[in-house]
């Protein structure tokens, strides 16, 4: 029985690639140094899979930045601003596309489906000249072969590539990206022919777009593309791989009748309905690559349950045509549990990172072939049993509180307009009130203080003194700038999710559980393993301390339940929404303690609310209902005069505007500066919004300092579609990553612009 891995993390068990990339970008090491680290990582990955007994080992899933950008390089589809003309694309052009350079900006980056990984979006149009400009896929296949490892080269499929692209600037909106298929397929043919000539017997084409809601003409594009490739593919075994969701019935029909294809890969973890499609009809003589090991989470597989699923499929496709696989690339999970020396032993026994998932895939394949590793299966069953019965997982009082939520929609009893009146009486704010989103710059010195306190190198007394001094500095800066609603700057926080997770029960933290987000940037998601509760107040001390330093309103700053959920590895033994409600109840306790502590403005960030939106439209309303309900649970118990803010960190939310209104926050601030028109068009089209709203007036992701006139112009554009009595003036995100030399003049320009418009409106402060 054969085994297969869809893809593997690139960063290395201790983020070796991250440090090699950043050293190269900083000019501290050479291209040769970077290539050496990369080659060593690839070699280790291939040898590890080979030693584990994996039959179909992927190559070309390694990348210096992103696999879609690698495909853009392969096709020579470099936007003209990067100065590439012909030949082989080098690292300078490649990294300029990814990161920009001194004279040109980077290409756009966006989320890879509903994961926390991001890809570089190709910019395409009728003028793009395609050419075979990166031989990476062939080179890496040959590199593995030279090490004695036979691999399956992986390419992003041609139709998914085009559907993941965007129109280049200036291209007519009516242009159909799929009309470029005849231009890119010749390059695919060249690559495939070279791989065949180099000795490849299998090739994997990733076509994840098959799981989306696609119109008929898009499905036809797949049929046409593979018919065109058929003669080039002949003599090869061809796997078309899909992942991240169920495949719709119509798409399944199209996929399983593609010409020139010998195998089909499916995510059977998130795509359980796909199992029914397979059982109701699978093409005879074709291979099924069954993704039963979860590539997106860190839990040990239920081997016995997976084996039952696989055995039921064996009868449909035949013993020699069933291949055990991962649900998607292991890129989306952590690298290796072996590096977790400090993690609690019981919790550790419940986990499997990428390296362990490779072993699970092999164990399942062997068990299917009648060679069960009894001790491995027994240890797995024991770990699952311990997880089910552990008192650390179940907290009865949390279960009761969550069960009691049923039957209420947790809305505040008073309408938002009356609440805003009560808040204005208390806060006495000018029109166009100014505020910031929460964090202030985190200096080297501040990070040192936090690090030393964590390592017990300085006392708690010294730590508290240092943080109080930092808060005082931030308060004084805001008062000097004449900002209306202040923040404490969050100097005590390293990360907006980890900070809360460390203080909530039911969370565990890894030392090396890093996952690539984009380029060299990695995130280390907390692990939610049990029922979530709040043992004691988390932020009240710091917020009250900050409020005591000023007469102006001080915002309490919390991360919302949906964002905590979407940025964590979440337990898989109960529905996600149940875990979210538990987090919401913990945040509710904190909100009420902040209110008791004299904090009259409380911000509950939901930066990642849209990120959790399912891929398929049919599933949107259920997700949005429980996500919005979770937010309302957090603040349904406060007085009318307590002002609840939320912040959202993305621009493209026009399709969920009604859910955002349904959150019933008093004020919403939104990352907007890069897409003014998109956001304002919603209100221009007549969406009625009566609560406070603060679309970001300048982009904090850039070091550029905006002028007063520029911000005033932005405010005027907003006033054209929004009432002056609900508009707030704020940057579009937190200021944590900026320097004080950038922040002070930018905030001054913002406050001056607000005052200028106030005076023009005849309502000077």
From Swiss-Prot:
Pathway info: Amino-acid biosynthesis; L-methionine biosynthesis via de novo pathway; L-methionine from L-homocysteine (MetE route): step 1/1
Binding site for L-homocysteine: 437-439, 490, 605
Active site per the UniProt annotation: 701
Residues that hold Zn(2+) 2 according to the record: 658, 662
Binding site for L-methionine: 437-439, 490, 605
SUPFAM superfamilies attached to this UniProt entry: UROD/MetE-like
GO cellular component: apoplast; chloroplast; chloroplast envelope; cytosol; plasma membrane; plasmodesma
Organ and tissue specificity: Expressed in leaves, stems and siliques.
CC cofactor note: Binds 2 Zn(2+) ions per subunit.
GO MF annotations in UniProt: 5-methyltetrahydropteroyltriglutamate-homocysteine S-methyltransferase activity; methionine synthase activity; mRNA binding; zinc ion binding
This protein's UniProt keywords: Amino-acid biosynthesis, Cytoplasm, Metal-binding, Methionine biosynthesis, Methyltransferase, Transferase, Zinc
GO biological process: methionine biosynthetic process; methylation
Binding site for Zn(2+) 1: 647, 649, 671, 733
Subcellular location: Cytoplasm, Cytosol
Catalytically driven reaction(s): 5-methyltetrahydropteroyltri-L-glutamate + L-homocysteine = tetrahydropteroyltri-L-glutamate + L-methionine
Pfam families reported in the protein's UniProt record: Meth_synt_1, Meth_synt_2
Function: Catalyzes the transfer of a methyl group from 5-methyltetrahydrofolate to homocysteine resulting in methionine formation.
Name of protein: 5-methyltetrahydropteroyltriglutamate--homocysteine methyltransferase 2
The species this protein was found in: Arabidopsis thaliana (Mouse-ear cress)
């Amino acid at each position: 029985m054969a085994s297969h891995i869809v893809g593997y993390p690139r960063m290395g068990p201790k983020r070796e690639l991250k440090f090699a990339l950043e050293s190269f970008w900083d000019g501290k090491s050479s291209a040769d140094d970077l290539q050496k680290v990369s080659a060593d990582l690839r070699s280790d990955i291939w040898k590890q899979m080979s030693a584990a007994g994996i039959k179909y080992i992927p190559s070309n899933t390694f990348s210096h930045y992103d696999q879609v950008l690698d495909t853009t390089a392969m096709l020579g589809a470099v936007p003209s601003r990067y100065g590439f003309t012909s030949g082989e694309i080098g690292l300078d052009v490649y990294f300029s596309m990814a990161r920009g350079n001194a004279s040109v900006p980077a290409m756009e980056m966006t989320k890879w489906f509903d994961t926390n990984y991001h890809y570089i979006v190709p910019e395409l149009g009728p003028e793009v000249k395609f050419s075979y400009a990166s031989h990476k896929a062939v080179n890496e296949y040959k590199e593995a072969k030279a090490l004695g490892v036979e691999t399956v080269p992986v390419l992003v499929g041609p139709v998914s590539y085009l559907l993941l692209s965007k129109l280049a600037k200036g291209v007519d909106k009516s242009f159909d990206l799929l009309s470029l298929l005849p231009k890119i397929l010749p390059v695919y043919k060249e690559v495939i022919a070279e791989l065949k000539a180099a000795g490849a017997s299998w090739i994997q084409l990733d076509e994840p777009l098959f799981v989306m809601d696609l119109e008929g003409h898009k499905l036809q594009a797949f049929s046409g593309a593979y018919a065109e490739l058929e003669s080039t593919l002949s003599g090869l075994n061809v796997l078309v791989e899909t992942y991240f969701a169920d495949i719709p019935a119509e798409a399944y029909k199209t996929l399983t009748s593609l010409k020139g294809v010998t195998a089909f890969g499916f995510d059977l973890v998130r795509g359980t309905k796909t199992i029914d499609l397979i059982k109701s009809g699978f093409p005879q003589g074709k291979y099924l690559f069954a993704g039963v090991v979860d590539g997106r989470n860190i839990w040990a597989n239920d081997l016995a349950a997976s084996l039952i699923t696989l055995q039921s499929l064996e009868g449909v496709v035949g013993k020699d045509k069933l291949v055990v696989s991962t649900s998607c690339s292991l890129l989306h999970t952590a690298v290796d549990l072996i590096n977790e020396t400090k993690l609690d032993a019981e919790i550790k026994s419940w986990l499997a990172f990428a390296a362990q998932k490779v072993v699970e895939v092999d164990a399942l394949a062997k068990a299917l072939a009648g060679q069960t590793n009894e001790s491995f299966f027994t240890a797995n069953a024991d770990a699952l049993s311990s997880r089910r019965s552990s008192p650390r997982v179940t907290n009865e009082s949390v279960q009761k509180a969550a069960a009691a939520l049923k039957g209420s929609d947790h809305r505040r009893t008073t309408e938002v307009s009356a609440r805003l009146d009560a808040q204005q009486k208390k806060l006495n704010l000018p029109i166009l009130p100014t505020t910031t989103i929460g964090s202030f710059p985190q200096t080297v010195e501040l990070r040192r203080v936090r690090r030393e306190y964590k390592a017990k190198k300085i006392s708690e007394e010294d730590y508290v003194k240092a943080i109080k001094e930092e808060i005082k500095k931030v308060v004084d800066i805001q008062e000097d700038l004449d900002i209306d609603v202040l923040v404490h700057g969050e100097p005590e926080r390293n990360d907006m999710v980890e900070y809360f997770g460390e203080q909530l029960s039911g969370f565990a933290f890894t030392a090396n559980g890093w996952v690539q987000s984009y380029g060299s940037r990695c995130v280390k998601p907390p692990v939610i393993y049990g029922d979530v509760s709040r043992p004691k107040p988390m932020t009240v001390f710091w917020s009250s301390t900050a409020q005591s330093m000023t007469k102006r309103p001080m915002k309490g700053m919390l991360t919302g339940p949906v964002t905590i959920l979407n940025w964590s590895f979440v337990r898989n033994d109960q529905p996600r929404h149940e875990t979210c409600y538990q987090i919401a109840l913990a945040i509710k306790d904190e909100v009420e303690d902040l209110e008791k502590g004299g904090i009259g403005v409380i911000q509950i960030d939901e930066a990642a609310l849209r990120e959790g939106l399912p891929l398929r439209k049919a599933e949107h309303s259920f997700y949005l209902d429980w996500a919005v309900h979770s937010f309302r649970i957090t603040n349904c118990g406060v007085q009318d005069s307590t002002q609840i803010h939320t912040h959202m960190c993305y621009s493209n939310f026009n399709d969920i505007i009604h859910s955002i209104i349904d959150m019933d926050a008093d004020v919403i601030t939104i990352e907007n500066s890069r897409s003014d028109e998109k956001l304002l068009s919603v209100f221009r089209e007549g969406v009625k919004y009566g609560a406070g709203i603060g679309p970001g007036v300048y982009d904090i992701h850039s070091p550029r300092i905006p002028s007063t006139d520029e911000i005033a112009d932005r405010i005027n554009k907003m006033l054209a579609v929004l009432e002056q009595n609900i508009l707030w003036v704020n940057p579009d995100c937190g200021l944590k990553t900026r320097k004080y030399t950038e922040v002070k003049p930018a905030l001054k320009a913002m406050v001056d612009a607000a005052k200028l418009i106030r005076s023009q409106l005849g309502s000077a402060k």
